Amino acid sequence: MIRASLISLVAVAAIALTGVALGGSQSDLAAVRSATAPFHDLQAAMDAGYTFQLPDIFGDTCIANLDNPSAGAMGVHMVSLARVGNPSLDPTDPEALVYERRNDGSLKLVAVEYVVFDTGQARPSLFGVPFDWNDGSRYDLDPFYALHAWVWKPNPSEPAGIFNAWNPRVGCED
C-alpha cells in the first residue's frame, strides 16, 4: 500500500514538473509576443531602432531558401544594429524582426530573430535551443549565429517548428 502510494506520488510529481517546464517555455514565448506586439506597426519598429529591410548580396530584401525552395522563406528582416552589437541576449528584445510581404505589398510581423556575431565563443542558445551558425556570406556579413522564433505565424517544419530558420508558410513571391 505504501509502495503504491509512493509510486503514485512520484508519477504525479513528474507530471506536475513536466507541466511547469512546458508552461515555462510557453510563458517565455508569450513574453516575446507581448514585447514585440507593438512592432506590428512598422513605424513603431523604426522608432525603436529597427532598420527597414536587410538585403542579401543579390539585393533581395525578402530572404528565401535558394537551396530548397519548398522549405519556404524567412521573410523581410528589420534589424537593430545596436541590438546586434550587444553581446547579451534578451528574449524580449530581439536583434531582428521578421515580416511577411502580403499580396498588397504591406508587411505583417511573423517572427523574431536573435543574432550573435561569431567571435569564437561557445554556441549561444535561448529557450533551450542552440542557435544556427551562418557564414554570413549571403548577407556580406561576418559569420554569426542566429535563432528564429516564429511567434506570430505557425511553422509546421520538422523537427524545429517554431525555431526553424525557414517557414514553408512564408514566401517571397512578388
Can you say where each PLM-predicted feature lies in the sequence?
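Positively charged n-region of N-terminal signal peptides that target proteins for export
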Residues: 1-4
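Bacterial N-terminal signal peptides
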Residues: 8-17
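Sec/Tat signal peptide C-region and signal peptidase I cleavage site
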Residues: 20-22
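Primary mode marks residue(s) on the alpha4-beta5-alpha5 output face of response regulator receiver
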Residues: 24-174
